[in-house]
Amino acid sequence: MALMMKSSASLKAVSAGRSRRAVVVRAGKYDEELIKTAGTVASKGRGILAMDESNATCGKRLDSIGVENTEENRRAYRELLVTAPGLGQYISGAILFEETLYQSTASGKKFVDVMKEQNIVPGIKVDKGLVPLSNTNGESWCMGLDGLDKRCAEYYKAGARFAKWRSVVSIPHGPSIIAARDCAYGLARYAAIAQNAGLVPIVEPEVLLDGEHDIDRCLEVQEAIWAETFKYMADNKVMFEGILLKPAMVTPGADCKNKAGPAKVAEYTLKMLRRRVPPAVPGIMFLSGGQSELESTLNLNAMNQSPNPWHVSFSYARALQNTVLKTWQGKPENVQAAQAALLKRAKANSDAQQGKYDATTEGKEAAQGMYEKGYVY
């Protein structure tokens, strides 16, 4: 009887030990560096320049100004961006495409070194794009987990210190349970792999603007997606202090008749964040998602009119580059003017991050919409 009691006690002890081990928080070798990197990117008055367009998408941008899509033209445009004088005052990080990570200026200086001199943290797009998700109503899933650990290790060696993975969620097509879970689980696995390689993961489940849905439906979907995403990140022992989020703002669909101004967008977006995002997360870096330059800046400014538990900032591509590209036109003599346009937009969003943006200084071009239905990044 005593032996049975002893055995029972031993089994309970072993079971308790296993239970405790099962919930031990990860302790990776890069944890301190991840927290430091995330803090640098999420620094006051600064945000992210997203310049990670694929070569095909970059080609569309160049074609819009009559410039041929060659590696040299892509390099020249990217050099214009990263060498803008004083850019680091407003930009804390830049997301690069793989080609860009290894490119250099015309004088032979690596882009990553140019960025580091301005205290701009180099980042890298690591997903491999979207493909149709079987047995759903036109939804998609994101490729790129195969070999991601090796790629992240190589990107770290090349100077990258954060990563980005973009999945998308379509409201008109669902989202279905399978699409929502696939999106969330893929983001969680990516985040865990990136952290283990020393890269701060930017987590981006983009809820597309496509559709006629109202702002309440957008709120409902965003809350569901972020709940799933944080659940799976917790399961994968992702360290929340070493991640950044890149959500879409909570807005009505592009075809909804009931539009929402900055105050309402801010109200709904902050409501979603407070319900779903732990305060341990250092930074919320919003995507513009096809909003005009002016609209995306006004909405960000509205969200920073009162203190938030996180650094609420921007990670814009088109909303920073649209006027820049039109000013440049592929001509060397326009580089200085194009860089001035970039700095103007970067400063505007820096001011918005601090809640002190003044829209009276904007020109008509900033209000031009950039929404494209079914946009492929």
Swiss-Prot record:
GO molecular function: fructose-bisphosphate aldolase activity
Enzyme class: lyase
Positions marked as site (Necessary for preference for fructose 1,6-bisphosphate over fructose 1-phosphate): 377
Catalyzed reactions per annotation: beta-D-fructose 1,6-bisphosphate = D-glyceraldehyde 3-phosphate + dihydroxyacetone phosphate
Transit peptide among keywords: yes
EC numbers for this chain: 4.1.2.13
Superkingdom in the source lineage: Eukaryota
UniProt-listed InterPro entries: Aldolase_TIM, FBA_I
Family listed: Belongs to the class I fructose-bisphosphate aldolase family.
Gene Ontology annotations for the cellular component aspect, listed alphabetically: chloroplast
Primary gene name: ALDCHL
Pathway of action: Carbohydrate degradation; glycolysis; D-glyceraldehyde 3-phosphate and glycerone phosphate from D-glucose: step 4/4
GO biological process terms on file: glycolytic process
Presence of the UniProt keyword Transit peptide in the record: yes
Alphabetized Gene3D superfamilies for the sequence: Aldolase class I
Subcellular location: Plastid, Chloroplast
Record keywords, A-Z: Chloroplast, Glycolysis, Lyase, Plastid, Schiff base, Transit peptide
Name of the protein in question: Fructose-bisphosphate aldolase 1, chloroplastic
NCBIfam families: FrucBisAld_I
Active site positions: 204 (proton acceptor), 246 (schiff-base intermediate with dihydroxyacetone-p)
First-listed, main subcellular location of the protein, grouped into a coarse class: plastid
Residues noted as binding substrate in the record, renumbered to the chain: 74, 164
